[in-house]
Curated annotation (Swiss-Prot):
Lineage summary: Eukaryota, Metazoa, Chordata, Craniata, Vertebrata
Name of the molecule in the record: Deoxyribonuclease-1-like 2
GO cellular component: cytoplasm; extracellular region
GO BP terms: corneocyte development; DNA catabolic process; hair follicle development
Catalytic residue list: E99, H150
Alphabetized UniProt keyword annotations: Calcium, Cytoplasm, Disulfide bond, Endonuclease, Hydrolase, Magnesium, Metal-binding, Nuclease, Secreted, Signal
PANTHER family: DEOXYRIBONUCLEASE (PTHR11371), DEOXYRIBONUCLEASE-1-LIKE 2 (PTHR11371:SF29)
Cofactor (UniProt): Mg(2+); Ca(2+)
InterPro entries: Deoxyribonuclease-1_AS, DNase_I, DNASE_I_2, Endo/exonu/phosph_ase_sf, Endo/exonuclease/phosphatase
Function, in words: Divalent cation-dependent acid DNA endonuclease involved in the breakdown of the nucleus during corneocyte formation of epidermal keratinocytes. May play an immune role by eliminating harmful DNA released into the extracellular environment by damaged epidermal cells.
Its EC number(s): 3.1.21.-
SUPFAM superfamilies the UniProt entry points to: DNase I-like
Organism for this UniProt entry: Mus musculus (Mouse)
Cystine residue pairs: C189-C225
Amino acid sequence: MGWPWAPLTAVWALGVMGATALRIGAFNVQSFGDNKVSDPDCGSVIAQILAGYDIALVQEVRDPDLSAVSLLMEQINRVSKHEYGFVSSKPLGRDQYKEMYLFVYRKDVASVVSTYQYPDPEDAFSREPFVVKFSVPSCATKELVLIPLHAAPHQAVAEIDALYDVYLDVIDKWNTDDMLFLGDFNADCKYVKAHDWPSIRLRSSEVFKWLIPDSADTTVGNSDCAYDRIVVSGAHLRRSLKPHSASVHNFQEEFDLDQTQALAISDHFPVEVTFKTH
């Protein structure tokens, strides 16, 4: 296809901020599998985007044998001067359609301390969170817990609310409240309306700080919806936030793509936040 982004590999893919800041992102890479990662145009851009983060959540991973993930990791490690590793959930879903949560992380910055699959006793989630505790020695908290969610669109209100139960479960299990909830919550437009927010505990409780505003547009297409979100809890982690760093990463502009080219990669933009390190 001869896309025009080739010269833009430079700074973003090198992850140069990693020594002075911790950048975390969440990216719903629509229907990520062998076809997408092996497409030289799509695979290269996805790898470059992910190599810009110290820790990144990838959603809509449909790759039970990890063949696409293995190729993705090769591509990330080829474009970055740093070595990346990954940890993933099992395929999740109530019916034949299943997705995996995938975290990729820069090995010299972060390491996996522990993981667990939220047991979901009330069957609140279509794809229950795969909870990961990372060690990040350069961060003030030293450890932080990442809780991913790709919410089923028409159950988004109930699923976002149920993240409060995951919050309590993590506190009970690991005795920490330094958590980052992130992913495609489908938290806007026809799935979550203004009158729904008061009933969502993750939103109504002052324990949580929502970093991506309702006014954001995290979609690549013509819609204007803040589907993808990042929510932080824990006094230590909140104090470590780099002010005004939470944002939507518009890779269409970054790589100078037209909308058709961008939509071939995903119908979502990544969302991201940066934490101060020492």
